[in-house]
């Protein structure tokens, strides 16, 4: 199974000049956690809800997010894959790099999709028990770290 089978194809993107506050409002409204930052169809970086939370502050029951441009706070050069990348490789990279979203680029380096941890969980949930999963899955017991 390839990234093209798991990715979200209708991806909301923003320009690097978009403010972090606007990006945050878009994420809240659309119930998403990641926004690829593009210019001319080319991926420049990715901004997440975590960026808004790190740079914002809590005021009462709300989060006040600054008017800084996302180009200043985005993660530039994110890990990416192509539509033919095996899902197991996407999962492995996302786990090893502790990321929750991976942009999918075509041969022309244009954004064609986004694989998120939610997409992968939905893929896992939709997998029939009669079909093997496209990646290894096992439960490991929790071990307490040694006392220091």
What are these regions, as identified by a protein language model?
Residues 1-10, 48-80, 86-97, 111, ...:
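Tandem CBS (Bateman) regulatory domains
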Residues 13-31, 38-39, 80-98, 105, ...:
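The conserved cystathionine-beta-synthase
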Residues 27-30, 35-51, 94, 102-119:
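A glycine-centered beta-loop-beta connector
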